[in-house]
UniProtKB/Swiss-Prot annotation:
This is Lipopolysaccharide core biosynthesis mannosyltransferase LpcC. The gene is lpcC. Pathway: Bacterial outer membrane biogenesis; LPS core biosynthesis. It is an enzyme of class 2 (transferase). Pfam families: Glycos_transf_1 (PF00534).
Length: 352
């Protein structure tokens, strides 16, 4: 448990289930700590190795930290903004409020009200920034290049899986309509019969309300006679190794906040075909690292995947380009440093 006197940045996480926002926090905080940022989390659903405040320690927020005149409350959800506002305005704690917005939709009146009370706002993409009505800084997410990296060992290849074929094409994330899993499966049913060297894998959690959706996809695969070549893996213990096993990754989301999976795939030296949901179009260089199509357009998605399935060497070449692109533009340290600059602008000068 960190000493509240040493904590200058509080990153609340008020959601128990794993989400894209939670994943961002989990990846960012260790990197921020390595950069010397004095940050701690608050809330459930985070790994035990992250510095985590107890709720009772919030009483210590009335006193500024040892080196600064105030702290930064870095919210990423509405409820986290609301708590920050209460702590500052109701209890008069010396806090500066920061919000990171990934949403790509018109905000509700309530969300707009919350955002207007922030001292600074970060947008995770130009597209998400276009929905904000307040000044903001665009800082795109990065990826941990130490965790997501190209194949290094035999276990990183398709042979280690025991699956048929020479190449894997994958779609990862929760299995649901919003994520476009059905569009991927439909494309695989159309393309794989002509290309026996490829096998497709779907990995991700199926929540209770989406079981019928997943069961329908599995039934479609069986009806197509492809149950040995389109596999549903469920949740796997380590998704990173599966990225390394892929020759092509597909991100077919109909709707997305930011969307980290293309970065994770490209960092693993894997070409990517994606919809234009989330920030995907800002991450992928069409014709060099992959391809981007309109969200919800299953036919366009299939057409974009087809050249890679027909020519695996093209996928390999674009995977090499993707790795260089991510290393040059999307290292996690780059994101952490940019956020650190926003923190410093809010914290002000050190206490004398």
């Amino acid at each position: 448990m960190p000493d509240i006197r040493d904590v200058e940045i509080i990153a609340p996480n008020f959601k128990r289930r794993l989400s894209g926002v939670t994943s961002t926090i989990v990846q960012l905080i260790p990197c921020q700590i390595r950069l010397g940022i004095k940050i701690a989390t608050l809330g459930p659903g985070l790994p035990e190795d992250l510095p985590k405040l107890k709720w009772r320690q919030l009483l210590g927020l009335w006193r500024p930290p040892a080196r600064r005149r105030r702290r930064v409350w870095h919210a990423r959800r509405n409820n986290e903004m609301a708590v920050g506002i209460l702590l500052r305005h109701l209890t008069r704690m010396p806090l500066k409020l920061l919000f990171t917005s990934a949403a790509q939709r018109r905000h509700t009146a309530y969300t707009k009200w919350l955002i207007r009370r922030m001292d600074a706002v970060i947008a995770t993409s130009d597209r998400s920034g276009s929905f904000l009505e307040v000044p903001h800084t665009v800082i795109q997410h990065g990826v941990d290049l130490a965790l997501f990296h190209p194949p290094e060992a035999a276990e990183d290849g398709i042979a280690a899986t025991g699956l048929p074929g020479r190449h894997l094409v994958g779609c990862f994330g929760r299995v649901r309509h919003q994520k476009g899993t059905d569009l991927f499966v439909r494309a695989m049913i159309e393309l794989l019969p002509q290309h026996t060297e490829w096998t497709a894998v779907v990995s991700g959690r199926v929540t209770a309300e989406h079981v019928a959706f997943a069961d329908k996809l599995k039934a479609d695969v069986v009806a197509a006679g492809l149950s040995d070549r389109i596999l549903f893996l469920g949740e796997v213990p380590d998704i990173k190794i599966w990225y390394r096993r892929l020759t092509l990754y597909v991100a077919p989301s109909r709707n997305e906040g930011f969307g980290l999976t293309p970065l994770e795939a490209m960092a693993s030296r894997t070409a990517v075909v994606a919809s234009d949901a989330g920030a995907y179009a800002e991450l992928i260089v069409t014709g060099e690292t992959g391809s981007v199509v309109a969200a919800s357009d299953g036919e366009a998605l299939t057409r974009a995947i087809a050249p890679y399935i027909a020519d695996p060497a093209l996928a390999v070449a674009h995977g090499e380009n993707a790795l260089r692109h991510v290393r040059a533009n999307f290292a996690l340290e780059r994101e952490a440093s940019a956020i650190g600059a926003v923190y410093n602008s809010l914290l002000g000068d050190n206490r004398s």
